[in-house]
């Protein structure tokens, strides 16, 4: 007998880096008629509320109808504006009551390949960016963006016992959006074993591409932590790619040294080194913010959720890669 979902939501994220910084005070003034609700602060009754320093602005971006192979879904769209130059756009879909698990997996597969989501998120981001442009400092949009999907189950057959529930349903098929192939037991067992809980009635499975949350009270604090982590992943990727380009420029300049006039080479070399130093300072500030975030997330459960996200997003690997590149740049620039 198929598992039936009675209540739940799907959050589809697209995260964009549009600038070096965004003045949230100025942006709030520009969007005062549209900004909905308080800054992000993870308020809950049973879990401790936490507040992110320089918490983002939340902006309502209207509604649309999303056409997927599994049906047409009304979509609520909202965005968060982060002071470190990032805009995260979220499409929220309600899971229709009575949805079978297999149909949810089919919906997941449709979401993964939907071009409509991409176009919708980009268009909403562009409109929002235009409206807050006076608040944007050092505008420079990166062509790469992050995507992620969070599935939130509030009520389903057997979900009152989350540990047993995830053994009954094919979690791996949902997380990996695989509606055609039958996945190996290893995939399913690994995901089940990685689950974290605050109480016996809730549960979170956080993977690199999507997450499953069982939240009987409809709480969104873990979902917010995942989105928060996703914005940091984008920043890690940006700095890693940017430093890689700077290294390539330096290596190219070194290769051309014999064919170039010495003072021209020195000027180019100095410019690259100076720019790299500025980026080093930017990244150092960013890294401090990430480390402070880990301390800020003071609730034990949310701290575990944040660390689980950091693990899945390979924060340590990105940090090491960036550190190696910065060390190489420093050595070459001396």
At which residue positions do the language-model features occur?
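Membrane-associated alpha-helical segments
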Residues: 238-334
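Generic structural hydrophobic/aromatic packing signal, biased to beta-strands
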Residues: 12-16, 89-91, 151, 203-205, ...
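N-proximal short alpha-helices
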Residues: 58, 62, 67-69, 209-212, ...
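Generic alpha-helical propensity signal that fires on short helical segments
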Residues: 28, 105-109, 229-231, 261, ...
